[in-house]
């Protein structure tokens, strides 16, 4: 009942653009954000640019605003001050359908629908063929467990994915985003339910597929983002560091503390020398 009474606050502007972008350059231009019922900014003066072919990672302690930042890109919320642009156009001037059709968003907890594996992967990718579905599953490291099921890709999925494990649910959600072949990928802490080996294999397989896309990864594990082209370090909603792993361990105390708390001395040394996997 409450949902029905809630007014939709994110709406299309009067002359919203419906043409898709050629080049997914995402720019945060001095963005502040606070929730409608909040008194203080959750994000403050966030300023950066992400280009196609780049992986931009977002890291920080719990409550630092990582997921909130990611949710601003598909306009789940609107910025309070500043603006976010896609190819130089304020995303508030682009129709919501057009904007979101170019984004593959994977939340922290995978979302599945009642149906079968095929329909869950192809949801949001009209016209995708069997080969496309299988490729998406392969990249998402889901093929092995799918092939182990008696009905393979036609295996039933319960509403909410209650009949698959957390890691399997996550891999199917990632496969769905890949199947869309979007210009922008947002992985909102989507790899946390995966073991280290699967995480590594998935990111390796993902790289050639996303080479022309703009990729955002919200992460808790430093190991997930060592090779990111740009790492944004958030602390209490502020951007306290921006650069590569090797740059940030020298210039950003917050990042150095996170890295040293998660990596062994040997791993930390190898990561700076570029000898890690």
Regions found by a protein language model. Give the residues of each.
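ABC-type nucleotide-binding domain
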Residues: 5-13, 17-277
């Amino acid at each position: 009942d409450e949902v029905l009474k809630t007014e939709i606050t994110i709406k299309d502007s009067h002359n919203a653009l419906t043409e898709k972008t050629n080049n997914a350059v995402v720019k945060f231009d001095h963005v502040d954000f606070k929730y409608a019922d909040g008194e203080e900014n959750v994000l403050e003066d966030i300023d950066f640019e992400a280009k196609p072919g780049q992986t931009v990672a977002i890291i920080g302690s719990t409550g630092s605003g990582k997921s909130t930042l990611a949710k601003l890109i598909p306009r789940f919320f609107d910025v309070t001050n500043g603006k976010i642009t896609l190819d130089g156009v304020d995303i508030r001037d682009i129709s919501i359908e057009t904007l979101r059709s170019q984004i593959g968003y994977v939340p922290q907890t995978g979302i599945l629908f009642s149906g079968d594996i095929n329909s869950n992967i192809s949801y949001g990718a009209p016209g995708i063929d069997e080969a496309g579905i299988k490729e998406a599953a392969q990249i998402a490291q889901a093929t092995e467990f799918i092939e182990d099921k008696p009905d393979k890709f036609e295996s039933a999925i319960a509403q909410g994915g209650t009949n698959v494990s957390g890691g399997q649910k996550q891999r199917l959600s990632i496969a769905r985003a890949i199947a869309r072949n979007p210009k922008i990928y947002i992985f909102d802490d989507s790899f946390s339910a995966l073991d280290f080996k699967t995480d590594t294999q998935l990111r390796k397989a993902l790289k050639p597929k996303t080479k022309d896309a703009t990729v955002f990864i919200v992460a808790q594990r430093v190991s997930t983002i060592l090779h990111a082209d740009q790492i944004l370090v958030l602390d209490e909603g502020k951007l306290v560091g921006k650069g590569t792993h090797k740059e940030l361990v020298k210039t950003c105390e917050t990042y150095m503390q996170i890295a040293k708390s998660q990596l062994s001395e040997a791993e930390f040394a190898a990561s700076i020398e570029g000898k890690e996997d």
